[in-house]
Amino acid sequence: MENSVQLRDVVPEDLELFLAYEHDPDAARRSRFAPRESEAFMTHWRTRVLGDPANFVQTVVVDGETAGNFVAWWEEDRRFIGYWLGRAYWGRGIGTRALTAFLERETARPLYADPVVGNTGSVRLLEKCGFTATGTVRHGENEHVLLVLGEGA
C-alpha cells in the first residue's frame, strides 16, 4: 500500500521535528550543512523562514506524521527551493511525490536549487521533477550543483 503524502502549512509543533531531522548525522553529512543549536535554529525558522511573507513554506506529512519541509525563497532576483526530509522517508518515492505537489503550489519560474555536490539523492530528486543542472557554484568551502526548472533551463 502506498503512503499518503500531503503538504500543509507549518505549525509550531513541526519545528522540533525539523530540528531533530537537521541533527541526523547522515543527513548533515550528505548536505554538508552543520546542525544548529536549538535556539539558533528556532530563531532562524521563526524570523527568517516563517517570518518572511515572501517565503512559501510547507510541511510534508506522510500517513499523518511530519516527515519534513519544503521552502521557497528569494535570493536577489532568483527564486530558490530547499527541503529537508527525515531519514525514515528517504528512498521511498516520498520526496518525489512531495516535491511534485510543492511545485504545483509554488508556481514561480524559473526556480532554482543548489544541493551540495555529492548529495546524489537530492540531485536525482530534482532531476526527476524536471530540474536541469546548469553548472556549479561555491558556498564557502563546498561546491554545489546549480539546477533550474523553467525558463532559462
Report residues per predicted region.
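Conserved GNAT-fold acetyl-CoA-binding loop/helix
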Residues: 26-46
